[in-house]
Each structure stands twice: as structure tokens, then as C-alpha cells.
Amino acid sequence: MATIFIVFVSFGCVFVLGIAAFVLCCLIKKWKCSKAIEKNEMVHVDQHLQVHENILQGPNGMKTVAITVDDDLHVHDEEECVKNEKLGTASTSKA
């Protein structure tokens, strides 16, 4: 019984340490990316407005107008990472 308990505790500790190592690696990658890369946030918005007008004739011969407005709005967040690279020119002229 004690052996089973020790085995499960050992595997649990290894599992928790593995998750902690994975999270630490992800944080380090994110920190390096944010330090070396300039982020440009772009927001792309699509808006479509459709108006439908329906004229219906009622039972008394009276006309009824029904207007339906469909507003379709899409917002897309796009992040572009552009590396901060400096382009240097090599000087090959002789003095």
C-alpha cells in the first residue's frame, strides 16, 4: 500500500514540475519576443447594412409596410510582429 502511495506521489510531482517547466518556457519565449519585436496592432472592421422593405396588403385592403434592417459587423484583430532590424550599408570605398 505504501509503495503505491509513493509511486503516485512521485508521478504527481513529476507531472507538476513538467507543467511548471512548460509555463516557464512559454513565458521566456513571450518575453524575448516582446523585447526584440515591435508589435503593430491592426483592427479590420467590416460593416454591412441591409435594409429590406416589404409591402403587405392586409385583409381590409390596407397596405402595411414592414422594414427589416440587418446590421452585420465583423471585427478582426490582427497582430503583426515586425523584427527591429537595422539595415547597414557596407563601405567599400578606398580613402
From Swiss-Prot:
Tissue expression remark: Accumulates in cells differentiating into tracheary element (TE) which undergo secondary cell wall (SCW) formation.
Annotated TM spans: 4-24
Effect of gene knockout: Delayed secondary cell wall (SCW) formation during tracheary element (TE) differentiation.
Protein name as annotated: Protein TRACHEARY ELEMENT DIFFERENTIATION-RELATED 6
Primary localization: membrane
Membrane topology: Single-pass membrane protein
Subcellular location: Cell membrane; Secreted, Cell wall
InterPro entries, alphabetized: TED6/7
Subunit field text: Interacts with the secondary cell wall (SCW)-related cellulose synthase complex.
Gene Ontology BP annotations: cell wall organization; plant-type secondary cell wall biogenesis; regulation of secondary cell wall biogenesis; tracheary element differentiation
PANTHER family in UniProt: OS08G0108300 PROTEIN, PROTEIN TRACHEARY ELEMENT DIFFERENTIATION-RELATED 7
Residues on Extracellular side: 1-3
Highest taxon listed in the record's lineage: Eukaryota
Lineage: Eukaryota, Viridiplantae, Streptophyta, Embryophyta, Tracheophyta
Function: Involved in the secondary cell wall (SCW) formation of vessel elements (e.g. protoxylem and metaxylem), thus promoting tracheary element (TE) differentiation.
GO CC field: extracellular region; plant-type cell wall; plasma membrane; secondary cell wall cellulose synthase complex
Cytoplasmic side: 25-95
